[in-house]
Amino acid sequence: MVLSCFWLPEHLFTHPEYRDCHLLYYTGITRTAKGILAEIVRSMFLNSSAHLAILENMKAHALDMAETIQRNDFETYGALIGKTWMQNQALDCGTNPPAVEEIINKIKDYTLGYKLPGAGGGGYLYMVAKDPQAALRIREILTQDVPNPRARFVEMALSGTGFQVSRS
């Protein structure tokens, strides 16, 4: 088995034109991942052709995403984030509960794409705003019309040092 490793430039995440377009919002909605992962793994072991096809498409999609980041193509990056969201929903019907859909409906016109990182169903909502003005509008909407007391924006930044493990 041959593994490939790609270096991905940070331009789409750090350049002033794009930096403020990446938004992370804690939805205040929770869901445990254990049951979700168990269902997906079960479908894989049962050779569910639908699930296996989705997983194969996700693999190709990850390579498309890497190529898009290497080309510094912001609009395609946002569209591919949206495609990721559609794939996640096809893999697990519990990915987008009504409370999450309500949040998305408020902001989707201002985004190129969005998704719930991780297992879905709640947690964080990552959004790629169309431009910095759209990002400001998203912040206004979700700050003025908070879906629950736990929901809030979370600052995020690309790490300059990468993943580090320390031992205490």
Label each residue range with its predicted role.
Residues 1-115, 126-168:
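C-terminal nucleotide
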Residues 118-123:
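Short Gly/Ser/Thr- and Asp/Glu-enriched loop/turn motifs at secondary-structure junctions
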